[in-house]
């Protein structure tokens, strides 16, 4: 079992990041939230890990915060929710907003995640609502409750930008290389523009 990894950030793909440690590159699957918090290539980063072992697959899943890792584990505890679906849920909004959606029974917010239908959303709400206690939320988090859907798209930015660049004819490798040099806090439109400037040099 692994607790965390600390190493150099070396790249990003649609659903994973590459972290180099002792000259070994680790492919670590992660959410849009964690991707949006990645530093510049070559900078050090720490990810909290969960290893998933199946008969035909062994994978590492990592997150920049323990809170997101714990939410990932909670989602995996639900029947019918696998790692891919859990990452999808953690990519539609912040962990806090996802908590709010579950506690408030907001099926609409939860079904925004690709691959999550109404029945799965209902199961998530039913099984996790009581596990997410109000005392886990800070006063600052409570102030955000009215805007649960307002800013939940930002974690899609990286994946959407990569997809857009590839749709324009660039390879995944070319798109990734350009995106690594772009400010990830920008909007999708501006990330695409900045990436294109780099690609057209």
UniProtKB/Swiss-Prot annotation:
A GO BP entry: DNA repair
Keywords: Cytoplasm, DNA damage, DNA recombination, DNA repair, DNA-binding
Alphabetized GO MF terms: ATP binding; four-way junction DNA binding; four-way junction helicase activity
A matching Pfam family: RuvA_N
Note on domains (UniProt): Has three domains with a flexible linker between the domains II and III and assumes an 'L' shape. Domain III is highly mobile and contacts RuvB.
Reported function: The RuvA-RuvB-RuvC complex processes Holliday junction (HJ) DNA during genetic recombination and DNA repair, while the RuvA-RuvB complex plays an important role in the rescue of blocked DNA replication forks via replication fork reversal (RFR). RuvA specifically binds to HJ cruciform DNA, conferring on it an open structure. The RuvB hexamer acts as an ATP-dependent pump, pulling dsDNA into and through the RuvAB complex. HJ branch migration allows RuvC to scan DNA until it finds its consensus sequence, where it cleaves and resolves the cruciform DNA.
Protein known as: Holliday junction branch migration complex subunit RuvA
Gene: ruvA
């Amino acid at each position: 079992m692994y607790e965390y990894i600390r190493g150099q950030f070396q790249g990003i793909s649609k659903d994973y990041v590459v972290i180099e440690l002792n000259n070994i590159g680790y492919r670590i699957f992660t959410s849009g939230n964690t991707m949006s918090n990645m530093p510049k290539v070559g900078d050090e980063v720490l990810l909290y890990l969960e290893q998933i072992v199946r008969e035909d697959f062994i994978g590492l899943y990592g997150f920049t915060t323990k809170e997101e890792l714990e939410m990932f584990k909670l989602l995996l505890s639900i029947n019918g929710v696998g790692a891919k679906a859990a990452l999808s849920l953690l990519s539609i909004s912040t962990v806090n907003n996802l908590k709010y959606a579950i506690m408030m029974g907001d099926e609409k917010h939860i079904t925004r995640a690709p691959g999550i239908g109404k029945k799965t959303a209902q199961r998530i709400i039913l099984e996790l609502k009581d596990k997410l206690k109000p005392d886990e939320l800070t006063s600052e988090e409570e102030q955000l409750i009215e805007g649960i859907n307002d800013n939940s798209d930002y974690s899609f930015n990286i994946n959407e930008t990569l997809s857009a660049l590839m749709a324009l004819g660039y390879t995944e490798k070319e798109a990734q290389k350009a995106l690594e040099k772009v400010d990830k806090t920008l909007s999708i439109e501006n990330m695409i523009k900045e990436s294109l400037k780099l690609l057209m040099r």
